[in-house]
A protein has these predicted regions:
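Serine-hydrolase catalytic machinery in alpha/beta-hydrolase-like enzymes
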Residues: 1-102
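The conserved beta1-alpha1 loop
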Residues: 2-4, 168, 194-195
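Post-His helix in hydrolase/transferase enzymes
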Residues: 233-246
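Gly/Ala-rich beta-loop-alpha elbow adjacent to hydrolase catalytic centers
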Residues: 107-116
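Acidic catalytic loop of the alpha/beta-hydrolase fold
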Residues: 171-174, 196-202, 228-230
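Short alpha-helix in the alpha/beta-hydrolase fold that links the catalytic acid
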Residues: 14-16, 177-180, 202-212
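Short beta-strand/loop motif that positions the catalytic acidic residue
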Residues: 186, 191-194, 198
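Catalytic histidine neighborhood in serine/cysteine hydrolases
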Residues: 213-232
Length: 268
């Protein structure tokens, strides 16, 4: 479970308790992991932080340099479309995959939804070759932290994920650095939830991720909820859609009872 920008694992856990309970009821063996991103987000990185925090001036006058408990998987470099801190996040996620996995799937919100799509992409067969090709044209290098030439999964540290879910997520855009995440299209089944009243993430940015996924606009893979920038974790219709998606993926791809939802591995 990958939290959004300026959140933390414990905060995201608290906000999605209802969703966790529903998933545990549907999948009794499920256990959700809530890592906190490695990049500390400072006050200066948060738009209008001082205006929205009345205690900010008091902290300054007392000489207290309190920073918010805010973290991110990356942050923008000025107003550009280049992200800083991404390498640290991939190294951190790789350690979680190795120490806590293997995982069946990954779920993320907002920036975490964007990261979830990237992680699903990175673990796909032949994605490394796409990065090698893109690197020659200004693309970023495939993360070395995801490589294991002695491993059992085609030189990677973890097998391909069975599914990914993005709530209010987005794609990194058309910058050459990030092209290989999305070209060729992400083959992992991805479910995208978008809020019709979301004013934080532009719809076109979210649809970039949708269209970068194979079957991204297939029925049941793109779902709008009548709200804003949040996870509809207590609304039965949308929780049911998530559970149905996961069941279809796990049961639909199983060849034996051992692979069924009752024996589902720990999702990320």
């Amino acid at each position: 479970m990958l939290h959004g920008y300026t959140q933390s694992g414990p905060l995201f856990h608290a906000k999605t308790k209802a969703l966790e309970k529903s998933l545990q009821k549907a999948f009794p063996q499920v256990k959700l992991h809530y890592p906190t991103a490695p990049n500390r987000i400072r006050k200066a990185d948060i738009p209008n932080f001082g205006n929205s925090n009345p205690s900010n001036d008091e902290s300054k006058s007392n000489g207290v340099e309190d920073e918010p408990d805010a973290w991110g998987w990356w942050r923008r470099r000025d107003d550009s479309s280049v992200y800083l801190g991404m390498d640290d996040s991939f190294m951190f996620i790789a350690e979680v995959l190795k120490s806590e996995g293997p995982f069946d799937g990954i779920i993320g919100f907002s920036q975490g939804g964007a990261a979830a799509g990237m992680v699903a992409s990175l673990l796909e067969p032949r994605r490394r070759e796409a990065f090698d090709t893109a690197e020659a044209n200004g693309g970023r290098k495939y993360p070395e932290s995801f490589l294991d030439d002695q491993g059992s999964w085609g030189g990677l540290i973890h097998p391909p994920l069975k599914f990914a879910v993005s709530y209010s997520g987005y794609g990194a855009g058309t910058h050459p650095l990030y092209k290989a995440f999305y070209e060729p299209k992400i083959q992992t089944p991805v479910l995208n939830f978008l809020g019709s009243l979301d004013i934080i993430v532009e719809e076109k940015r979210s649809l970039f991720l949708v269209d970068a996924c194979t079957d991204g606009r297939k029925e049941g893979r793109l779902i709008y909820h009548p709200g804003g920038h949040f996870v509809p974790s207590s609304q039965g219709q949308y929780v049911g859609a998530l559970i149905g998606f996961i069941k279809d993926i796990i049961d639909g791809g199983s060849s034996s009872k051992e692979d069924s939802v009752e024996n589902m591995n720990v999702p990320f």
